[in-house]
């Protein structure tokens, strides 16, 4: 049972929290029925993502056995067989599709996510830039799935913020991974368990891309908080009463601090390989996140 639980990677489920963005920003988080629908979508994405992790471990088992950390994963270490992994992945996918079918059109987001991952695992993650864009697309599908589950309109600006933030985090992750590569790995040595594609992110170009996405994220979110509702709604009438809340400008200090703190951790502390760890273990980031939630919640719901 323990190998299965480790293969599910429950710590990674924190990435699925963005599913609640549509519910939170629509001002409907106090609606019990909609909250249940959003939680159902969250559970469905957790099951789907765990299935993807198992399949990914099956594909990468030979390379993982050469990696100092990944060699301890159940499939790479042999504590869980490939056949068992395939069986569990099928069960998880079936359960995920069943749950998502209970909440409107969220099943299409789950389906799209699974198709994306079916391309990502064997191919896209080995192609420079397409790998990080695939990660961003996965987060976008999570946000869309959460909104479709509660049948709520979703601001294009919020989707844009999600995509840009996901690209920023993915590029920071690749930059951190590349910074920890040895000279042999940078030269293309595949006997160390690292993917050769990581060497492509070792140059200054990655630093420039990180800076661009950090700036784009901050500018887009700033506009989201400052522009009038009629502009933010992008022609969607149902969004006009939910966007452009004047008080949202007070969330900007927390957002700016969070992005700058993250950059500091990546460039000064050599972190960034595990974004979920930074979000849940770094005290300043936790405080910034709680501050954002408190201010945004107060503006939207009071």
Q: Language model features by range: what are they?
A:
Residues 1-65, 78-91:
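Topogenic membrane-insertion module of multi-pass membrane proteins
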Residues 2-5, 122, 140-302:
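C-terminal membrane-associated helical module and adjoining short loops/tails
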Residues 61, 66-111, 156-167, 207-219, ...:
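Multi-pass membrane catalytic core of lipid/isoprenoid biosynthesis enzymes
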Residues 33-37, 105-110, 128-132, 153-159:
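Short, aromatic-rich membrane-interface segments at the entry and exit
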Residues 4-11, 73-85, 101-106, 124-132, ...:
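Short, amphipathic, aromatic/basic-enriched membrane-interface segments that mark the entry/exit
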Residues 17-21, 39, 43-50, 87-98, ...:
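Generic alpha-helical transmembrane segments of integral inner-membrane proteins
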Residues 48-76, 124, 130, 172-179, ...:
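Acidic (Asp/Glu-rich) catalytic motifs at the cytosolic membrane interface
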Residues 24-28, 95-102, 120-123, 145-150, ...:
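Hydrophobic alpha-helical transmembrane segments
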